[in-house]
């Protein structure tokens, strides 16, 4: 984890087959500004002082720990396919 200029804690990034993930711990004061019943847009979470590269989406609310914001973004096509971009016409075995 790393600390930002605003005492927020940014997790290391982790991923699955579809997405890259990270979570951000905000301060108690900032957690009071987080909407209770909906996800935030990029404009909203940036206005709270969260700093990340473009493309991250606030994707989940974890009720017991409202000060932990969960983010994800799609993996790039080259990461999903191991460096080879596949055409949409490929037939796969399932």
Swiss-Prot record:
Q: Annotated Gene Ontology MF terms? A: cyclin-dependent protein serine/threonine kinase activator activity; histone binding; protein kinase binding; ubiquitin binding
Protein task? Binds to the catalytic subunit of the cyclin dependent kinases and is essential for their biological function. Has a role in the exit from M phase during early mitotic cell division. More specifically, thought to act by degrading B-type cyclins that causes breakdown of nuclear envelope and exit mitosis.
Write out the GO cellular component annotations. cyclin-dependent protein kinase holoenzyme complex; nucleus; SCF ubiquitin ligase complex
In terms of SMART domains, this protein maps to:
CKS (SM01084)
Keyword terms of this UniProt record: Cell cycle, Cell division, Mitosis, Nucleus
The UniProt entry, under SUPFAM superfamilies, shows:
Cell cycle regulatory proteins
- Does this entry carry the keyword Transcription? no
**Name of the protein in its database record:** Cyclin-dependent kinases regulatory subunit
Instruction: Report the gene knockout effect.
Output: Worms exhibit defects in the completion of maternal meiosis, embryonic mitosis and arrest in embryogenesis.
Gene name, Swiss-Prot/TrEMBL: cks-1
Subcellular locations according to the entry: Nucleus
> Could you give the subunit structure recorded for this chain?
Forms a homohexamer that can probably bind six kinase subunits. Interacts with cdk-1.
Family named by the database record: Belongs to the CKS family.
Q: Kindly list the biological process annotations in GO that this record carries.
A: cell division; regulation of mitotic cell cycle; regulation of mitotic cell cycle, embryonic
Q: What is the lineage of its organism?
A: Eukaryota, Metazoa, Ecdysozoa, Nematoda, Chromadorea
Q: What is the effect of changing residue 10 to F?
A: In ne549; reduces cdk-1 binding
Which domain of life does the protein's organism represent?
A: Eukaryota
């Amino acid at each position: 984890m790393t600390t930002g200029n605003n005492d927020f804690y940014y997790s290391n990034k982790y991923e699955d087959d579809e997405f890259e993930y990270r979570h951000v711990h905000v301060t108690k004061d900032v957690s009071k500004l987080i909407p209770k019943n909906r996800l935030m847009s990029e404009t909203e979470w940036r206005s709270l002082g969260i700093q990340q590269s473009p493309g991250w989406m606030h994707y989940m609310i974890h009720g017991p720990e409202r000060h932990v914001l969960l983010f994800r973004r799609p993996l790039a096509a080259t990461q999903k396919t191991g460096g080879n971009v596949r055409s949409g016409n490929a037939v796969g075995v399932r």
